[in-house]
């Protein structure tokens, strides 16, 4: 058993599946096609109207009541009242006669047939378009004459569905802005460069308080002093690596480790003939280097002060770890004293 009132399709399908309005089929053919057209609103409307009624001959004079305030709710109830007895009238075989012509014209004015018909409706098209709710036309299957309604309600001319690519201005704005985090290369004066180099000779790794004091003294930013020390350490390590590789050492000897807590931090090419540095390493014992390392402070002390005791044979000959640590400490003290006297 079919329920046309419950399973009625949307209003967009009659425009595609609607038969030719001028074609009138006999009652036997209509009963033969009842299985295919029982769900069409157009068939229900055609059954309920008189046989001699033509669907496209709606008079324009009868279209004036919507302007006088005919409510849409009444037409909707009328459509439901007229749509429900349609199947019963088809099953009974006799068209209903309880409806008046006024109710039929009122229903047909707001029905699907009146809206989709291509008859003269220039006077009543604004009223019909305002009375029909937009939700009943959710499918895009419409005739060519119905496209202006779709454009006016769903696709207004003021708003474009697909935006133009040229309207996007945020990629161009992002290109024009400078990248964050990039600092310009600082240009240091001779006084600033000399002061930075002097501090670098004292300590390769400057502490944060000393760095802030030096930056405030030279009129620089803390980040500029930090970056300068990083670049200077990298340059120093590269030159130190070349020297160590030429003498058979490695670059890791300049880094503080457990076996080498006080690495050699002296610059390349700044030592005299008697001020040679000690190549510290776990497997590089050298009697001559240990002796020169222990005798480095003798060249830097004041001649008025009594000199230190001469190194013992055990100290000069043994390449053990304690002697290496003491030698490196004496080297650092000697460098600091030399810098103080020069300044």
UniProtKB/Swiss-Prot annotation:
Low complexity compositional bias, start-end: 314-323
DNA-binding region per UniProt: 181-240
Biological process annotations from GO: cell differentiation in spinal cord; regulation of transcription by RNA polymerase II; ventral spinal cord interneuron specification
Keyword terms: Developmental protein, DNA-binding, Homeobox, Nucleus
Compartments reported by the entry: Nucleus
Biased composition (Acidic residues): 326-343
Residue numbers spanned by region Disordered: 56-100, 240-343
GO CC annotation: chromatin; nucleus
A GO MF label: DNA-binding transcription factor activity, RNA polymerase II-specific
Pfam families in the record: Homeodomain
SMART domains linked: HOX (SM00389)
PROSITE patterns on file: HOMEOBOX_1, HOMEOBOX_2
Classification via PANTHER family: DBX, HOMEOBOX PROTEIN DBX1
Described function: Could have a role in patterning the central nervous system during embryogenesis. Has a key role in regulating the distinct phenotypic features that distinguish two major classes of ventral interneurons, V0 and V1 neurons. Regulates the transcription factor profile, neurotransmitter phenotype, intraspinal migratory path and axonal trajectory of V0 neurons, features that differentiate them from an adjacent set of V1 neurons.
Family indicated by similarity: Belongs to the H2.0 homeobox family.
Name recorded for this polypeptide: Homeobox protein DBX1
